[in-house]
Amino acid sequence: MKALSEVFGKLVEKIRGVSYIDEATLQDLSREIQRALLKADVPLDMVKAFTDAAVKRIKEEKPPAGIPPREYLLYVLYEELVKLLGGEQPPEFKPTKKPYVVLLLGVEGSGKTTTAAKLAKLLVKRGYKVGLVETDTVRPAAFDQLRQLAEKIGVPFYGERDGKDAVEIARRGVQNLKNLDVVIVDTAGRHRNEEALLQEVKAIYEAVSPDEVVLVIDATVGKLAAAQAEAFMRYLPIHSVIITKMDSTARGGGALAAVAKTGAKVKFIGVGEDVDELEMFIPRKFVARVLGMGDLDALVERIKAVFEEEQVIQEIESGKLDLLTFKKQIDGLLKLGPLSKVFQMLPGGLAAKISEEQIELSQKNLKKWRAILSSMTVEELKNPELLNASRIRRIALGAGVTPRDVKEMLTVYENLKRMSKTLKRQLRMKMPR
């Protein structure tokens, strides 16, 4: 979402730079808002309606006491963007029967097959038993792709490599996996023509009676997402939408807005290529991140999940901050995924102020430090004072680094140890237990 954040980040900086808001300033900011929305590929009619609504509120509403007009303008922008992208009501995905059958639809190139595996992985994490069914008889690689992904995430798979009848494959697949909690059925994304594709998915829909029909749309299509959604809606009900590739384009904003306009509910967004990179789409959190307000809730939840698992919080609270605890912290940070994704959640536009080079260097340092710590004995990890020059040389050799690298890491550790009281307070404030 970096591209989208950059577009709106410039707008937010401009708003924060004004000292007061008169008619001329408001008109100028209105044009900037329109430019940002158009760059995000939001449909023109929605851009106009959005701007009119925001300007009307700024003119008619009085900011609460103590709130500067520019801050209130940001608040209005935030609220109107949330409305534009679907409103405050967070989406839900709760299987209500067994098996709960999910039918995935989408055109070729939307990332549908990968999304099937991502959704399965997310549901497995929530404790559901999930199976995957491949019905694509047009694209030969689809069978192997989904089977391999199913093996990677450890879920049952059904498909027929040489099958010709997608409808029968779907029916047999659901029957074979009927003892699971959720069965996700992947369908073809291309056919002889659009009509044939839509007729096939309609026939599969009638054969397996899915509990939820999910349309997968590529974010790069921008405002054209509405046309895709409406084309499928003419043939069968669309219960929810997943927008993929949100990490690679600013046009994702337009795709989200266009889908919301059709009345369909965006439930998930794909934010990377890995099977773990599918997120529940919550408009207010999404908008906060795009505007540079951050999504500390999401960041804290992810950190808490990892650090609680490793019992790092308890160890720091007890005042125990040896190299063993330091190693657990590094392992925990690396479990969060790429640091670029973690930094995107920071507030106040901090992510934009951290260069790609700095993030990459931080990622490399974490991996280097983990290698260094892994080369130490348990005794050394628990008692860092044992680390003399001879031991440091041995550790450096085992980790494939220089003794200087080891000493630099130990300096970072000592600094962190001195900051442990502050860190302890932060953990208590941000991660209530």
From Swiss-Prot:
It is found in: Cytoplasm. GO terms for molecular function: 7S RNA binding; ATP hydrolysis activity; GTP binding; GTPase activity. It is an enzyme of class 3 (hydrolase). One of its GO terms (biological process) is SRP-dependent cotranslational protein targeting to membrane. Its EC number is 3.6.5.4. It catalyses: GTP + H2O = GDP + phosphate + H(+). GTP binds at residues 106-113, 186-190, 244-247. InterPro entries: AAA+_ATPase, P-loop_NTPase, Signal_recog_part_SRP54_M_sf, Signal_recog_particl_SRP54_hlx, Signal_recog_particle_SRP54_M, SRP/SRP_N, SRP54, SRP54_GTPase_dom. GO terms for cellular component: signal recognition particle. Its main location: cytoplasm. Belongs to the GTP-binding SRP family. SRP54 subfamily. Involved in targeting and insertion of nascent membrane proteins into the cytoplasmic membrane. Binds to the hydrophobic signal sequence of the ribosome-nascent chain (RNC) as it emerges from the ribosomes. The SRP-RNC complex is then targeted to the cytoplasmic membrane where it interacts with the SRP receptor FtsY. This is Signal recognition particle 54 kDa protein. It comes from Pyrobaculum neutrophilum (strain DSM 2338 / JCM 9278 / NBRC 100436 / V24Sta) (Thermoproteus neutrophilus).
